[in-house]
C-alpha cells in the first residue's frame, strides 16, 4: 500500500480517476482489516432531498486572495452526534488526529470536544471509551456556535475531495493525546491525502464532491510515515450512545506537506511551514466567524484532476452566537525601500528654502520714496552740515572718486598756504568760527541754502572763493570756484575779464559781496560774479612785501563800508592804494548799476555756457 501511494505522489501532476480509486480501494482494504470488528466506515445519513445539494451548488463562491493562514488541528468527536451537530467547524485548515482514551481531561481552551462543537445544548461529554476524533484548535476563547441542520451535514459530508488544494498539517508536540502505536512513528510529519471516494457503502449515497479552496498540497521529502485521517469534512450520523465507528485511516507515504500561500477565505491567510515548526500557530490576519461544521470547503474552485461530480459548497457560514476572539496581527515585513516610499508619501511637501530677500519698500511712489526717514526735530541743514559732501550742482553732480581722493591732499596745499592764508591773516578771519562768513557762507552752505530757497533775494552777503579753473568764451568766462568745503560753478563778467585779466587765473582768491546765485533747478546752482561783487583779489604773485600798508581788519558791515576793502592790491599796489581810498574811481556809477542787473547778465550768456566744460 505504501508503495502504491508513493507511486501516486512521486510527481506533482494529477492522475486519472482510475489510478486514484484503485489506490484508495487498496488503502481501504488494509485499513479496514487493521481496525476492530465493531468499527464501521464513516457514512452520512441522507434525510433531506437532493435539492439541498443542488441549491448549494448554485451559490456563487468568491475567489480569495493568496495569503498565509494558521492551521488549527481537528479531532473528531468520540461519540455519535447526529442530532446535536449544530456547531460550525472552523473554516481554517484542521489537522486530524485520533483522540486518546483520556480525552476527558483535555483543556477547554485547547480543545473543543464533540459535545462543544456539535451540540447546541450544553450536554454532557460522551463516554471517552469510544475511539473517535476531537476538534482541537490552538485558538483559545472560542465559544459555542450555532450549527446548521443535520440534513445539510449529511448531504455535505457524504464525500469530500482534496483537489488543487494545499494543506499544512502539524502534529502538536506538546499535546497530551497518544496516537496508536502503529501511527506514532513521527508526530511532526504531515501527510497529503486526497479522497475521491469512500467505501462501497458511501457510494450508494449521493456524492457531493467539494472542491477545497485550500492551498494545493505539494509532497516533499520526509523521514517517516504517519497515517493521518484523510477526511476533512466528517459526518457523525450515529445516535448518542451507539458505538462510534472508527475512522478510516489512509496510510500515506511519509511526506512533509508544503502548501503554497493561497488564501481560502478573507481574513484567514495560511502561514508558511516555518511558522508551524515551533508548534504554535501564528495568526497573520483576523479570523472570520466560523461557519458550519462542514464549512471546510467554502466553494468549488478549479481542479486539475478530471472529476465529474456535483460541485457545491457544503454549507454556508452562519452567524455565530459568540464572536471569535481576534488574534494579534503579525508584524509585516518592512524593507528600506518600502519605508522610504511610505515616508515620502506621508511627508508634507515642503517648499525649497530660499534666503529671504527683503524688498525695499517705498514710502511713496518715485525714487524719493527710498530716501531715509528724517527724524522729527532735525533740520535738513543740520543733517547736511553734519555730513559734508561734494556739492551736487549741475556740472559736478557726479563727482569722480579719484578727484575726491586727490583733493584731500590738495586742501592742505591750497588752503594752508598762499593767497588763502594771506587773506585770512590780512582780515583776521577764522574759518572754524561759526560766526565767520567763511563758515556760514561756505560753498557747501550756499548750495544747501539755495536748494532750500533760504537765500534772501538769491544773494550771498559775503563770500571768499578760490578759482580752480577758468574757461574763457566770447562773452563771459565759466569758472569753477572752490573752498575747503566744496566746489561750485559760476560765471565771471566780461568787464572783470578785461580789467583783471592777469589776476583772474587758477589759484587766485576772490573776496566777494552780494553775489547773485542762479538756480535753474534744485540741483544746479551757479555764482554770478560781476564787477560790483568783487571786493579784493588775492593772486599767487602777491606777497606780504607787496602791500604798502598792512591789511586793515574788515568792519562788521562789509556791505556798507567799501573804504577798508583793498581790491587789486596784489596786482597793482599803487592802483590798489588809490582804489582803496576812492573805490568809486575804479568802478564808475553807471558800470556798477549795470553789473547789478542779473537778468541782463544771464540773458547774454549762451546756452552752452551752463554745460559742463570739457576737461
Curated annotation (Swiss-Prot):
GO terms for molecular function: single-stranded DNA binding. Residues 47-71, 232-241, 257-275 have a biased composition (Polar residues). This is Homologous recombination OB-fold protein. The gene is Hrob. DNA-binding protein involved in homologous recombination that acts by recruiting the MCM8-MCM9 helicase complex to sites of DNA damage to promote DNA repair synthesis. Interacts with MCM8; this interaction is necessary for MCM8-MCM9 helicase complex recruitment to DNA damage sites. Interacts with RPA1; this interaction associates HROB with the RPA complex. It is found in: Nucleus; Chromosome. GO terms for biological process: DNA synthesis involved in DNA repair; female gamete generation; interstrand cross-link repair; male gamete generation; recombinational repair. The modification Phosphoserine is found at residue 47. It comes from Mus musculus (Mouse). Disruption phenotype: Deficient female and male mice exhibit infertility associated with impaired ovarian development and arrested male meiosis. Pfam families: HROB. GO terms for cellular component: nucleus; site of DNA damage. Residues 302-317 have a biased composition (Low complexity). Keywords: Chromosome, DNA damage, DNA recombination, DNA repair, DNA synthesis, DNA-binding, Methylation, Nucleus, Phosphoprotein. Residues 42-75, 213-326, 546-590 are annotated as: Disordered. Signal peptide: none annotated. InterPro entries: HROB. PANTHER family: HOMOLOGOUS RECOMBINATION OB-FOLD PROTEIN, UNCHARACTERIZED PROTEIN C17ORF53 HOMOLOG.
